[in-house]
């Protein structure tokens, strides 16, 4: 990047703050770096985990949803602080595999409404492949935004937000915290020149 004379120092500084880990080595230093180890290596519980949520502006809530059949189904409730930082302030986590019982769309929608406890989210962001669950939520009056499915773009985006301190997690979201600390690159795929995460600890 430093070889690009068209970039001002201000822009270079912004780019440096956006990337970390393998993406920093590739995009900023111009090095080929294999994707290995912890994906969100910038995640720091001292910086990103909150015990006090008194600074939240409780007006516009959003829910992100990872809908699973065998894998876990997760709802995360997001709200902004006065500073503009987004905070994941509540989680719902249910693994049909661990509980040895799958739930229906109706049961998950009932769980969502109970979990929201009267909160009406602006939008629920959900994988477009969860078509039947989306239909159930729309029937109940929720506004749906279909999530983008590009995994690497999502990883880069979340890593950038973490690196710049623009998102944080409540300490009442133990599964989300665990997954941020446990999400790793697939080293066998990396040896073949393919960047992809291990399909584990990727639900929250």
Cite the ranges covered by each PLM segment.
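Charged alpha-helix within mobile-element recombinases
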Residues: 19, 23, 197-204
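Short, structured patches in soluble enzyme cores that scaffold and shape functional sites
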Residues: 1, 30, 44, 77-79, ...
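Mg2+-dependent endonuclease catalytic cores in nucleic-acid-processing enzymes, primarily RNase H-like
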Residues: 84-199
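ATPase catalytic-site recognition across NTP-hydrolyzing enzymes
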Residues: 3-65
């Amino acid at each position: 990047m430093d070889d690009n004379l068209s970039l001002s120092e201000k822009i270079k500084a912004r780019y440096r703050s956006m990337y970390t880990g393998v993406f920093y080595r590739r995009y900023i230093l111009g090095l080929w770096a294999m994707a290995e180890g912890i994906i969100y290596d910038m995640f720091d519980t001292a910086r990103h985990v909150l015990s006090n949520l008194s600074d939240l502006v409780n007006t516009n809530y959003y829910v992100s949803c990872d809908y699973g059949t065998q894998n876990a189904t997760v709802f995360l409730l997001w709200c902004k602080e006065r500073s503009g930082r987004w905070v994941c302030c509540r989680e719902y986590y249910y693994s049909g595999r661990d509980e040895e019982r799958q739930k229906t769309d109706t049961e998950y929608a009932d769980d969502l409404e109970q979990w929201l406890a009267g909160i009406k989210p602006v939008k629920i962001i959900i994988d477009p492949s969860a078509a039947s669950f989306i239909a159930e939520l729309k029937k109940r009056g929720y506004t749906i935004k279909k999530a983008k499915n590009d995994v690497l773009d999502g990883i880069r985006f979340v890593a950038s937000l973490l690196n710049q301190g623009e998102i944080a997690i409540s300490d009442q979201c133990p599964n989300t915290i665990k997954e941020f600390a446990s999400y790793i690159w697939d080293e066998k795929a990396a040896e073949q020149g393919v960047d992809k995460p291990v399909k584990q600890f990727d639900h929250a």
